[in-house]
A protein has these predicted regions:
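Extended beta-strand/beta-hairpin segments
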Residues: 2-67, 78-161
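Alpha-helical metal-binding/catalytic segments enriched in His/Glu/Asp
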Residues: 72-73
Length: 161
């Protein structure tokens, strides 16, 4: 079966043409125990992630969750800004997640900071890209607890210099 056969046809917003139509409606992965509390995760496309609760040989599941939300929002924001004809020369997002101290120790809040530079960037464009990601497109964000507070700030580097 080809990749095309695995996908459902659906309407894609113009700002997302180029990557959202490549999303599978069902994702599969495999997690294999290695030793102690170390596991190897493998995606359906063969990418691997090592998990280690002791942080000696891999990351924790909560670290990858924080990276996943940062990655999902960043992919959306950069793609939407490019569709708005912005030329991004650098982009970095830092993420800080605050967790509940008692089990199940879920994330209560996530603070994200975007540092971006390039041509054609304006606060209005970045605000719009962030809003589209959070309100409509970021599947990781929309898969998490409804009471998770996600705060996104940004700095356009070199603006006004």
């Amino acid at each position: 079966m080809s990749r095309t056969d695995d996908r459902k046809d659906h309407d894609i917003q113009p700002e997302l043409v180029g990557y959202k139509e490549e999303i599978f409606p069902v994702n599969k992965s495999r997690l294999t125990w290695q030793r102690d509390l170390c596991f190897l995760g493998t995606t359906q496309r063969g990418y691997e992630v090592e998990f280690d609760v002791k942080y000696e040989e891999g990351c924790s599941p909560t670290e990858t969750l924080l990276l996943s939300i940062a990655g999902c929002i960043s992919i959306d924001v950069v793609h939407i800004l490019q569709k708005m004809r912005c030329e991004i020369t650098s982009y970095e997002m830092t993420a800080e997640g605050t967790r509940q101290l008692t089990p199940p120790q879920y994330y209560k809040s996530v603070d994200l900071m975007i540092h971006v530079s390039g041509k054609g960037l304006t606060p209005a464009k970045i605000d719009r890209a962030i809003a589209l990601s959070l309100n409509k497109y970021c599947s990781v964000y929309h898969s998490l607890r409804k009471d998770l507070a996600v705060n996104v700030k940004y700095e356009i580097e070199g603006l006004g210099s």
